[in-house]
Design a protein with these regions (language model features):
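Residue-level recognition of pore/gate-forming positions within transmembrane alpha-helices
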Residues: 31-33, 54-57, 75, 79
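Hydrophobic alpha-helical membrane segments of integral membrane proteins
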Residues: 48-52, 66-76, 97
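Internal transmembrane alpha-helices of multipass membrane proteins
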Residues: 49-61
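C-terminal membrane-associated helical module and adjoining short loops/tails
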Residues: 62, 80-228
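Multi-pass membrane catalytic core of lipid/isoprenoid biosynthesis enzymes
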Residues: 4-50, 96-107, 142-148, 208-225
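Cytoplasmic-side transmembrane-helix entry/capping segments in multi-pass membrane proteins
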Residues: 25, 68-78, 204-210
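Acidic (Asp/Glu-rich) catalytic motifs at the cytosolic membrane interface
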Residues: 1-15, 70, 111-119, 186
Length: 228
């Protein structure tokens, strides 16, 4: 019902009545079961990570999304588990700072989305997300400032620790820091000035400067690790 009141989510298949509740429940049981079976056949470690991810998503859907602060922390934790799953599959021990950076970046995007959604919906926000009754713009802005700073600091620590980025005694990974700073500031600009941000995935698909930021960062890593 809450999705039907949301200006964007109301077009989702279940909210729009395109998919019945029975079909949705069947898919909710069948698809995770198939995914877990495939994960177990690929790597037992991946199975346990994926199982934890599904448990977290179920807990979020039925309870945690209504608890202030936990509603955003759980979403960010889901992204960390995805990074962990990647590390498990390729059997590489990833840096703790990478997990921290990924989690904080996810938190940055989630808070930005919540902030823009809350600002756009106004008094109707609580009818779309019950938890919005416990938020206000001042709190969301303070959280966004803290997480933005923390994201940048942990990313710098990750690049400093990354030995794969060191060439001739110089840590070339630090060259990517200005690019990341620009990306974070660009996203804040889109939230506060352009009043976008309610759908981070759409922004990443439509905003050319952000696309360029991601592309340049990926190319920088490729060149430093594989060509230098």
């Amino acid at each position: 019902e809450a999705d039907r009141a949301h200006p964007q989510k109301k077009s989702r298949p279940l909210a729009a009545g395109i998919v019945s509740t029975q079909v949705a429940w069947l898919a909710a049981v069948l698809l995770p079961t198939l995914a877990l079976a495939a994960a177990y056949s690929l790597h037992q470690g991946l199975f346990w990570v994926l199982l934890l991810y599904f448990v977290l998503q179920v807990a979020y859907s039925f309870s945690l999304k209504h608890i202030v602060l936990l509603d955003i922390l759980v979403v960010a934790a889901g992204f960390v588990l995805r990074v962990l799953a990647g590390g498990v599959v390729i059997e590489v021990q990833l840096s703790p700072w990478l997990y921290t950076s990924a989690g904080l970046l996810a938190l940055f995007l989630v808070i930005g989305k919540r902030r823009q959604e809350f600002s756009t919906l106004g008094e109707a926000a609580a009818s779309v997300r019950r938890v919005y009754a416990h938020y206000n713009l001042a709190l969301l802005d303070d959280m966004l400032r803290i997480v933005t700073t923390s994201t940048l600091i942990t990313y710098i620590l990750y690049t400093v620790e990354a030995r794969t980025m060191v060439r001739n005694g110089e840590n070339l990974g630090l060259l990517t820091v200005p690019i990341v700073i620009y990306g974070l500031l660009r996203y804040l600009y889109l939230i506060h000035v352009r009043k976008e941000g309610s759908a981070p995935d759409e922004i990443l698909l439509t905003d050319r400067p952000l696309q360029a930021t991601i592309t340049v960062t990926a190319l920088a890593y490729f060149v430093i690790i594989y060509l230098l």
